[in-house]
Design a protein with these regions (language model features):
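Nucleotide-sugar donor-binding/catalytic module of glycosyltransferases
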Residues: 36-288, 302
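Active-site donor/metal-binding and catalytic loop motifs
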Residues: 269-286, 316-322, 455, 521, ...
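C-terminal, non-catalytic tails of nucleotide-sugar-dependent glycosyltransferases
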Residues: 2, 6, 10-68, 289-331, ...
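Short, acidic, metal-binding catalytic loop of nucleotide-sugar glycosyltransferases
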Residues: 92-101, 352-362
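Glycine-rich, basic loop-to-helix element that forms the pyrophosphate-binding segment
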Residues: 136-152, 396-414
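Short beta-strand-to-loop acidic/aromatic patch adjacent to the donor-nucleotide binding site
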Residues: 154-165, 416-429
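Conserved donor NDP-sugar-binding/catalytic core segment of glycosyltransferases
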Residues: 169-205, 426-473
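A short, conserved alpha-helix in the catalytic core of glycosyltransferases
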Residues: 235, 245-271, 300, 433-437, ...
């Protein structure tokens, strides 16, 4: 009864925090989903079907690590006073793997009062020669992990905590993923999977962490990779293993150093690791282990120093998150392009906020007049150009509305190092908004494009990046979420690598704009920003979004969609088809910075109703 009461209190605390972060509707929706899964849903929803696991075991029957055809993966696990229940569950999860290509390397630093740890391990060793063990002096988590690595015989290493659980198909799936990469001639130095949180049983998981493909800017904000990471032992040896001075964030530090050498990673969208939530675990938050933040900031600062980039590492918006305030190189000029047709009240609000609130002063504004009919509009233009130093109004010569054509025309008058596409119904919220956009681009190795955090007037999110494939074409990350929330895996509160951002506020290097030939004028109204971003990414550039540049977008939530007007509906369908034709429908529906196990029907990062790929144990991997 006490355990049930404790669990109820934990859930109540989670519900209160979720309500504070994301609002009552989100909490109720998630709560309903939890009750549905708990009471009516299938158990073990992230595990492959029983027949799939049986087929894997049949494939590997009678084989050893030497002849199973899969690379050997040595799992490094430091032990320290591990409770018997947790230890046995962890050891069972290794012993019951569907493939024999794993080796378990245990370095035991338990004190004299916990001799049962050694006894239990020796009991398992007697039945399984793939478990190796060494009693060591306790020198901290990093040094103890390094001691475990000295026992490793595998081509690959993986890290696992002593109180967690490996999914039964973890070694099989990672081994097969390596073979897939090799068959395609792609790098195979670093792989990572999705994971889930659990408390009592992995058959009743709390939630999953469905991760994006390799996202280097996101990784600088939090260790989203976490478990299960698998990497070549040769790389581990090259970087010298884990660093004791980063104890608490030793894995984050290790991943940064490994990825400096690989230049990328492969993501396997299968839940291969179960992270136990209990008092004192890092899965319960850094409040349980406050030294984690200091170690993480050191790891990040050292990473910047090694890679020759300069900036200041600070705490992020939430515990376990961080931010790099990149040093801006030089004094880049920004040309702000604002298309406008009448609506001078909106335009004046926008312009006033630019000059009244923007701390970055090296900018010019080019208003692109597009077929206005109200005489007051033209009178306002004259007044505004006298009032705002650096404002110029130019007239688009063609009839009709073509967002791409209008901005391409405005580019001809721009003199900045960067272009900023900005809607006329946007208002600045924080003084450093333009500085923060530039921070992400105007430094060595910076992104080519950066998008901003846009809010509706009612303080809900309008834009935290674009996810392609939502609704069949594209949608906005965390749309309608309450302002100030962390979002899914902190993705509404940390710098994000993305496939696209909205053209309502989009900063791009002028040189990249010119290289791409600007916006494609075949996309007159819809998807011009998405198409442009995809072309930029396909050319090898990065696109990011920052929560530190905030503006209000007065676009109406209730504005009718194009499908309500037959002419607009046909135009929308045509532009959607062109998006498919240019970039491939399969690519549009498979955003690498999303996850195939998340829904395509909503913009809230909720789980897909169809987790077929998990139930089938489908082995897919993508290097990025």
């Amino acid at each position: 009864m006490n355990l049930r009461l404790k669990r109820a209190r934990e859930l109540a605390g989670y519900a209160v925090q979720l309500t504070k972060d994301e609002g009552l509707p989100t909490m109720l929706k998630r709560g309903a989903g939890f009750v549905k899964r708990r009471c009516f849903g299938k158990k073990a929803r992230y595990l492959p079907a029983k027949k799939v696991l049986e087929a894997q075991r049949a494939e590997m029957a009678g084989k050893t690590a030497a002849d199973c055809g899969l690379p050997t993966i040595s799992v490094l696990t430091p032990l320290y006073n591990t409770p018997e229940k947790y230890l046995r569950e962890f050891l069972d999860s290794f012993v019951n793997q569907t493939a024999p290509n794993g080796q378990l390397c245990l370095a035991d630093a338990s004190d004299a009062q916990h001799g049962d740890v050694q006894r239990i391990v020796e009991e398992y060793q007697a039945k399984n020669q793939r478990i190796v063990y060494k009693k060591i002096e306790n020198k901290g988590i990093a040094a103890n992990t390094n001691a475990a690595a000295q026992l490793a015989a595998g081509e690959y290493l993986a890290l696992a905590d002593h109180d967690d659980i490996l999914a039964p198909h973890a070694m099989y799936t990672m081994g097969k993923a390596v073979l897939q990469l090799r068959q395609r001639g792609e790098p195979d130095g670093f792989l990572y999977s999705d994971e889930a949180l659990f408390s009592k049983s992995i058959r009743r998981p709390i939630a999953a962490h469905f991760k994006p493909d390799y996202a280097p800017d996101y990784l600088l904000c939090c260790n989203y990779i976490c478990h299960l990471a698998v990497f070549k032992k040769a790389l581990w040896d090259a970087v010298g293993g884990e660093r004791p001075e980063c104890d608490g964030s030793q894995d984050h530090d290790l991943f940064l150093r490994l990825l400096e050498r690989t230049g990328g990673a492969a993501h396997v969208p299968q839940v291969l690791y179960y992270w136990r939530v209990h008092a004192g675990s890092t899965s319960g938050g850094t409040e349980a282990k406050p030294y984690v933040a200091a170690a993480a900031k050191k790891a990040l600062a050292d990473h910047l120093a090694r890679t020759g980039r300069t900036g200041t590492v600070e705490d992020g918006l939430f515990p376990s998150t961080y931010r790099v305030k990149w040093d801006i190189v030089g004094d880049p000029k920004v040309s702000i392009l604002i298309p406008n047709k009448d609506h001078i009240d909106d335009l004046e609000k926008c312009l006033h906020s630019l000059w009244a609130k923007t701390s970055w002063d090296n900018f010019e504004v080019i208003v692109i007049e597009n077929n206005s009919t109200d005489p007051e509009t033209f009178a306002y233009y004259q007044k505004a150009q006298q009032c705002y130093d650096g404002l110029r109004v130019v007239t688009y010569p063609k009839k009709g509305f073509n967002f791409s054509g209008i901005n391409n025309f405005g580019r001809k008058y721009a003199t900045g190092d960067y272009l900023l596409l900005l809607n006329n119904d946007v208002e600045v919220r924080n003084a450093d908004w333009l500085t923060e956009l530039l921070r992400q681009c105007a430094h060595p190795g910076g992104a080519a494009i950066c998008g901003a955090e846009l809010f509706y007037p009612d303080e809900t999110l309008q834009h935290a990046g674009v996810i392609t494939g939502l609704g069949g074409y594209a949608g906005h990350s965390h749309k309608y979420k309450k302002a100030g929330g962390s979002g899914y895996m902190f993705r509404a509160a940390t710098v994000q690598d993305l496939s696209a951002v909205t053209g309502a506020c989009l900063l791009v290097k002028t040189s990249v704009w010119d290289e791409m030939g600007g916006l494609d004028e075949a996309f007159a109204v819809a998807f011009n920003d998405v198409d442009f971003c995809l072309r930029v990414r396909e050319a090898g550039y990065r696109i990011v979004w920052t929560p530190y540049a905030q503006l209000t977008h007065y676009e109406s939530k209730s504005r009718g969609g194009d499908e309500k007007d037959p002419v607009k509906a046909r135009r929308f369908a045509s532009e959607q088809q062109r998006l498919y034709d240019v970039h491939g429908k399969a690519n549009i529906l498979d955003d690498p910075y999303y996850n195939p196990n998340l829904t395509r029907d909503r913009e809230d990062f909720s789980e897909s109703d169809d987790l077929r790929s998990l139930k089938e144990g489908r082995v897919s991997v993508r290097w990025r």
